[in-house]
Amino acid sequence: MAGHSKWANIKRQKARVDAKKGKTFTQLSRAIIVAARNGIADPNGNFQLRTAIDKAKAAGIPNENIERAIAKGAGTYQDDESILEEIRYEGYGAGGVAVSIEALTDNRNRTAADLRAAFSKNGGNLGQTGCVSWMFEQKGVVILEGEIKEDKLLEASVEGGAETYEIISEAEYQGAEVLTEVANLENLNQTLQERGLPVKEVELRWIPNNTIEISDPDQGRSLLKLLDTLESLDDVQNVTANFEIAENLTTLISAS
């Protein structure tokens, strides 16, 4: 069951970007609004909402802000954020790398303009709907953080209906990612927690079916800068790209 390295390569390549920034309060609050709107406003009966709240609390968002976001999603508190749309944008980075972007916006024209500018400044271009979506498949991901015993992870993953997992053991990070079908994410998360594994968070993620290895340092820098720029936009919730950086370039790019 152990996963092919492609499952975690995107996570590793983004470590440098993610270390510099976390999700903003705006991004996390919007995730709560949409989750409450798409289901019931009770986190006990809405897994998407419960997950969004957990992430917000981990980021230090005050409870009153969380409650306000839930109310907006439920329709009992009205403002501009109450009319948020979920939109998936697609484009190409340097060298034709496919980029998938999930956004929550109250003004799709503003969001498209911001994304177009981000792509053009970093050697890419915003594409038409459907141009790269076929290159990705949505999966449920349970992220573990800490030292992982593989035999314990394997047993729990099989029991929880996981498709694959990847253990990440590096000097700066110890953990694992466990993938499953979207409909099975809540069950897998519960199983891993019940088996005592260190679950940090869960999420839905678009996983590339295949990846392109980047061996040119300038292209690698351009792509990482593009991801950084896209993820810094408040309207953007998640960004996925179908590339991995050649191992011999990782240190060089990270040091630049």
Each predicted region: which residue ranges?
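N-terminal cationic and glycine-rich segments that engage phosphates or anionic surfaces
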Residues: 1-127, 132-141, 185
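Positively charged, low-complexity, intrinsically disordered RNA-binding extensions
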Residues: 143-256
